[in-house]
C-alpha cells in the first residue's frame, strides 16, 4: 500500500514527495488513537481522510505558492511531526488487549487472520486505484505527469490534477501507516522514519 502511494507521486506525477515519512506517521497516530478508543475501523477510514488532507497541503504549496517540491515536502513533514504528537498526546501508545482490524479478522480467518486482513485491504486499495487511473480524471492525472504543457493546452487544470494526485498518494501512505499501527498493536511518533526509502 505504501508503494502504491509513492508510485503515484514519483512515477505518475514525476514529482518527489518527501512528506511521506510524516504522512505515514499521521496514519499511525489517527489509527492508533481510534483503536485505543475502541473503533479500529473508524481509525482506518479517518487515516485515509487525514492523509488526503496532508497531501492536498503539499500539492497546494507546490501549485499555488510555487514552493519547490522537495521543500514543500519537507515543510509538510515538519508540520506533521508536531501534529502527530498532538494527536497522540504522547510519544507512543500501546494497543495491548485492544481490538484492531486484525483481531476482528481472527474470528473469521483463524491462524491466517493477519495475512487475510492485510491482503483484503491491499486488494481493495489496488483495485480502486487502478480503476480510478482508467477513468477520465485518472487519465488526466497520468497525462499531467507525462506532459503538463500539453495538458494545459487541452484545457485541463494541471494544478488541480497535481493536488488530487498528492491527496490520493498520501491517503494511501497514511492507510499503510494505519495498517502498520494496528498490525503491530502500537503507535510511535517516529515510526515513519525511512518510509520513503522502504516504499
Segments the model singles out, each with a brief description of its role:
Residues 41, 66, 104-118, 187-191:
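Interfacial loop-to-helix junctions that mark the boundaries of transmembrane helices
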Amino acid at each position: 500500500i505504501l508503494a502504491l502511494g509513492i508510485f503515484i507521486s514519483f512515477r505518475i506525477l514525476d514529482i518527489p514527495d518527501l512528506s511521506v515519512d510524516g504522512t505515514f506517521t499521521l496514519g499511525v497516530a489517527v489509527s492508533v488513537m481510534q483503536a485505543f478508543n475502541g473503533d479500529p475501523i473508524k481509525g482506518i477510514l479517518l487515516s485515509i481522510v487525514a492523509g488526503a488532507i496532508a497531501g492536498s497541503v503539499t500539492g497546494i504549496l507546490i501549485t499555488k505558492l510555487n514552493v519547490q517540491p522537495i521543500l514543500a515536502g519537507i515543510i509538510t513533514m515538519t508540520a506533521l511531526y508536531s501534529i502527530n504528537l498532538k494527536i497522540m498526546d504522547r510519544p507512543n501508545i500501546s494497543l495491548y488487549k485492544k481490538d484492531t482490524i486484525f483481531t476482528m479478522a481472527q474470528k473469521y480467518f483463524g491462524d491466517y487472520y493477519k495475512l487475510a486482513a492485510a491482503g483484503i485491504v491491499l486488494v481493495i486499495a489496488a483495485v480502486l486505484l487502478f480503476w480510478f487511473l482508467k477513468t477520465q480524471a485518472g487519465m488526466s492525472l497520468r497525462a499531467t505527469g507525462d506532459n503538463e504543457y500539453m495538458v494545459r493546452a487541452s484545457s485541463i487544470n494541471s494544478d488541480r490534477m497535481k493536488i488530487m494526485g498528492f491527496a490520493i498518494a498520501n491517503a494511501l501512505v497514511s492507510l499503510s501507516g494505519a495498517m502498520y499501527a494496528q498490525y503491530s498493536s502500537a503507535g510511535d511518533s517516529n515510526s515513519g522514519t525511512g518510509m520513503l526509502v522502504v516504499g
